[in-house]
Amino acid sequence: MSATILDGKATKNTIFEELRPRVARLAEQGRTPGLATVLVGDDPASHSYVRAKHNDCAKVGINSIRKELPADASQSDVEAVVDELNADPACHGYIIQLPLPEQLDAGPLLERIAPEKDADGLHPISLGRLVLGEQAPLPCTPRGIIELLRRYDVPLAGARVAVVGRGITVGRPIGLLLTRRSENATVTLCHTGTKDLAEEVRRADIVVAAAGRPHLITADMVRPGAAVLDVGVTRTDSGLAGDVHPDVAEVAGFLSPNPGGIGPMTRAMLLSNVVEAAERAAS
């Protein structure tokens, strides 16, 4: 058996096509959505990530707002930019690109973002509202995972899901999303304290691997026909490696590879959050 590939790139392009008319309608009202990025320093990877986000904006018709500061920027310098974006009606959502230079404290800066402009969906208030079932921007990567599964008709209601990794970006929030009534999955959150990881994974209909450990999930751990999503990524001597061993493709029913799976979906959900924020502001 060879797994059906959950193609994040193709799905991202489809979502972009769906966003374009929504953006155009807002533009006709003089309310073109705007995504801002705050980039501090000269890290090549950060510049590449930010450039990709703004290229995505151009494809959909979203306005790009770029705020770039030197590597020696102070905490107050970045705070001033955050305050400016919070007050800018042309900005409907923004991100502070991480990592930041070592002299900066990321936590207070991220909390300073106006919750309604939290494009990543990871502001403490956004996560609190998610727990309460209230409207808020959703975390981009978990939202992208669920959207990808839905687009390929992978059943969620009643499914047993093993989430491997308990990070704030994916592991913890995806459990909140998957256990909403709209999804109705049963979630097991696995981590370094899990006694028998292989057994927990083997019971699952859906596996979300987000531990950041190369090839942690092997073929013998996966139930035949299960959906496996490789989210974690690690830089090794031979290049980037995901959490899922390539041999899993011969056992799984569905596989979201890394790269090409969840990364593009995260970018699509970032733009979706911004468009939805603009629509709320216009209503």
UniProtKB/Swiss-Prot annotation:
<comment type="similarity">
    <text>Belongs to the tetrahydrofolate dehydrogenase/cyclohydrolase family.</text>
</comment>
<dbReference type="GO" id="GO:0004477">
    <property type="term" value="F:methenyltetrahydrofolate cyclohydrolase activity"/>
</dbReference>
<dbReference type="Pfam" id="PF00763">
    <property type="entry name" value="THF_DHG_CYH"/>
</dbReference>
<dbReference type="GO" id="GO:0009086">
    <property type="term" value="P:methionine biosynthetic process"/>
</dbReference>
<comment type="pathway">
    <text>One-carbon metabolism; tetrahydrofolate interconversion.</text>
</comment>
<comment type="function">
    <text>Catalyzes the oxidation of 5,10-methylenetetrahydrofolate to 5,10-methenyltetrahydrofolate and then the hydrolysis of 5,10-methenyltetrahydrofolate to 10-formyltetrahydrofolate.</text>
</comment>
<comment type="subunit">
    <text>Homodimer.</text>
</comment>
<keyword id="KW-0486">Methionine biosynthesis</keyword>
<dbReference type="Pfam" id="PF02882">
    <property type="entry name" value="THF_DHG_CYH_C"/>
</dbReference>
<dbReference type="InterPro" id="IPR036291">
    <property type="entry name" value="NAD(P)-bd_dom_sf"/>
</dbReference>
<dbReference type="InterPro" id="IPR000672">
    <property type="entry name" value="THF_DH/CycHdrlase"/>
</dbReference>
<dbReference type="GO" id="GO:0000105">
    <property type="term" value="P:L-histidine biosynthetic process"/>
</dbReference>
<dbReference type="GO" id="GO:0004488">
    <property type="term" value="F:methylenetetrahydrofolate dehydrogenase (NADP+) activity"/>
</dbReference>
<dbReference type="GO" id="GO:0005829">
    <property type="term" value="C:cytosol"/>
</dbReference>
<protein>
    <recommendedName>
        <fullName>Bifunctional protein FolD 2</fullName>
        <ecNumber>1.5.1.5</ecNumber>
        <ecNumber>3.5.4.9</ecNumber>
    </recommendedName>
</protein>
<dbReference type="InterPro" id="IPR020630">
    <property type="entry name" value="THF_DH/CycHdrlase_cat_dom"/>
</dbReference>
<keyword id="KW-0378">Hydrolase</keyword>
<dbReference type="GO" id="GO:0006164">
    <property type="term" value="P:purine nucleotide biosynthetic process"/>
</dbReference>
<keyword id="KW-0554">One-carbon metabolism</keyword>
<keyword id="KW-0028">Amino-acid biosynthesis</keyword>
<feature type="binding site">
    <location>
        <position position="233"/>
    </location>
    <ligand>
        <name>NADP(+)</name>
    </ligand>
</feature>
<keyword id="KW-0658">Purine biosynthesis</keyword>
<keyword id="KW-0521">NADP</keyword>
<feature type="binding site">
    <location>
        <position position="192"/>
    </location>
    <ligand>
        <name>NADP(+)</name>
    </ligand>
</feature>
<dbReference type="InterPro" id="IPR046346">
    <property type="entry name" value="Aminoacid_DH-like_N_sf"/>
</dbReference>
<feature type="binding site">
    <location>
        <begin position="165"/>
        <end position="167"/>
    </location>
    <ligand>
        <name>NADP(+)</name>
    </ligand>
</feature>
<dbReference type="InterPro" id="IPR020631">
    <property type="entry name" value="THF_DH/CycHdrlase_NAD-bd_dom"/>
</dbReference>
<keyword id="KW-0368">Histidine biosynthesis</keyword>
<keyword id="KW-0560">Oxidoreductase</keyword>
<dbReference type="GO" id="GO:0035999">
    <property type="term" value="P:tetrahydrofolate interconversion"/>
</dbReference>
<keyword id="KW-0511">Multifunctional enzyme</keyword>
